[in-house]
Amino acid sequence: MKTFSAKARDVKRDWLLIDADGKTLGRLATKIASCLRGKHKPEYTPHTDIGDYIVVINASKIKVTGNKFEDKIYYHHTGYVGNLKSIAFKDLQTKNPETIINKAVKGMLPKGPLGRDMFKKMKVFVDSEHTHGAQQPKVLDI
């Protein structure tokens, strides 16, 4: 018997809706990354993109444990000498809350072209309104 290997063209992709209201950031991000990779499907193949589309709503209401709300800092470098920029979690949550979930999930996906394609299938919205009602996403409880 030959080993089954899923093909990207044969995969049926679902649309899943996740409400981030009151959820812990890391636990939510691991579930999203797992669904984007397709690990919840029986035909999972590591080298093929078979994951589902994910719509995340209420990104501004995400929670973190401990003192991370005050202490967590996100860093990025501009590429110029001495330009290491930083922003605190609480400032980022008020300014651009979808970035928090994007950074957490992107770090859990494979690096390279496959991971970039997986990441493009995640749509994050700040409040409970989203633009993907026509796709009829199924609610996924976490």
UniProtKB/Swiss-Prot annotation:
InterPro entries: Ribosomal_uL13, Ribosomal_uL13_bac-type, Ribosomal_uL13_CS, Ribosomal_uL13_sf
Transmembrane segments: none
HAMAP family: Ribosomal_uL13
Assembly and interaction partners: Part of the 50S ribosomal subunit.
One biological process term in Gene Ontology: translation
Species annotation: Vesicomyosocius okutanii subsp. Calyptogena okutanii (strain HA)
Protein name: Large ribosomal subunit protein uL13
One Pfam assignment: Ribosomal_L13
Task performed by this protein: This protein is one of the early assembly proteins of the 50S ribosomal subunit, although it is not seen to bind rRNA by itself. It is important during the early stages of 50S assembly.
Keywords: Ribonucleoprotein, Ribosomal protein
MF (Gene Ontology): mRNA binding; structural constituent of ribosome
Annotated Gene Ontology cellular component terms: cytosolic large ribosomal subunit
Lineage, highest ranks first: Bacteria, Pseudomonadati, Pseudomonadota, Gammaproteobacteria, Candidatus Pseudothioglobaceae
Family statement drawn from the similarity comment of this UniProt entry: Belongs to the universal ribosomal protein uL13 family.
